[in-house]
Amino acid sequence: MPNLPHLTPSSLRTLRDVLGKDRLRRNVPLAPYTTFKIGGPADLYFEAQTAEELARAIQVARTLDVPYFLLGMGANILIGDGGFRGLVVRNMADRIDVRPEAGRIWAESGAVVYPNVIDAAVDAGLSGLEHYVGIPSTVGGALWQNLHFLSPPPERTRTMFIEEVLLEAELLTEEGDRRTVGVDYFEFGYDESILHRRDDVVLAATFQLEPGDPARMREIMAANLQWRAERQPPLDPEPSAGSIFKEIEGIGAGRLIDECGLKGTRIGGAEVTHRHANIMINRGGATAADVRALINYVQEVVARETGYELEPEIAFVGEFDPPSDATPVVVPEEDGLVSAEERAVFRNEGVEERRKG
């Protein structure tokens, strides 16, 4: 049994009884469940299929004082090579209920924003969510980070936030209560919400939308997908966690990194992609130690050359080894391609299986 400081044999029996003996798994590699395809094993792993199962898993972990981490699509995070000492609850609660007459759509927090929630809204002629097409996120993750994207073409003059269409959400609070709260509860900001400061868990959310023309919404979706494809690497074949650093008001983090000549910089299997300087990709076999070393290096160079301090946007989860001491190298753009073999490994098995081979 993994060394869990707060887990007694009695506690383990309780977890099995509450979550199901056959559904509580041990020593599960987490790399395949993240968009970075990086991360060691979880001591304990459970997949919640409904909001009720999600609440039950969190409640029993809290009662037993077992460390836990709630995993959605696995974007915007870097899991350490040592994995997670505790219980990882993967949120797969994904029911969706469209209420066209009220202009509303309700979804459990594990529902994937795109395509599932957005397509359901567009098919019902409800507008407001189509702007967030192509961003890997669950409903819970969208509220965690106040999901955002640029306004529709051709203007693209302002940033649109998920808070603008959120009506209310159902929570399991850090105190253990089930509550329905309005948008003001979340104290939203840029990449920010109260969920960063409180141990509340989103169980479901309701969005208030407007009647819209499905054809026009599909046009916006296609334009946004094209815009993203031109500027950001696809997760297949180039796994990433999305933007690595928070934006600096008035100047983009990617612009600073690019001006410092850091595109193509690689440490181990981690690389600053030529497509977008604020995105690092897993070129195959990258470790969390590689990524941490590359993050540190980029921060040091940008601070030295520009005076700006870059702050990571991604969350660091679990146990980390010391950053890699490999020497940074710059890879020419024409070499920044991933082979078909690497694509197959990422898609079917994840990085852990690649290492075994």
Please report, for each region that a protein language model flagged, where it lies by residue:
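Short, low-complexity, charge-dense intrinsically disordered segments
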Residues: M1, E349-K356
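Eukaryotic N-terminal low-complexity, Ser/Thr- and Lys/Arg-rich leader segments
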Residues: P2-P5, F346
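Anion-binding (especially nucleotide phosphate/pyrophosphate-binding) glycine-rich loop
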Residues: L4-Q145, F149, K356
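Intrinsically disordered, low-complexity regions enriched in serine, threonine, proline
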Residues: S10, A340, A344, V351-E352
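Phosphate/pyrophosphate- and phosphate-bearing ligand-binding catalytic cores of soluble enzymes
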Residues: R25-R26, P32-T35, I77, L172-N296, ...
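Glycine-rich tight-turn/loop motif centered on a GG-T
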Residues: D43, P152-E155, R283-A288
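Short, basic and Ser/Thr-rich N-terminal targeting/leader segments
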Residues: L64, L71-M73, E164-V165, E238-P239, ...
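C-terminal structural segment of proteins
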Residues: L78-N224, L256-D258, G264
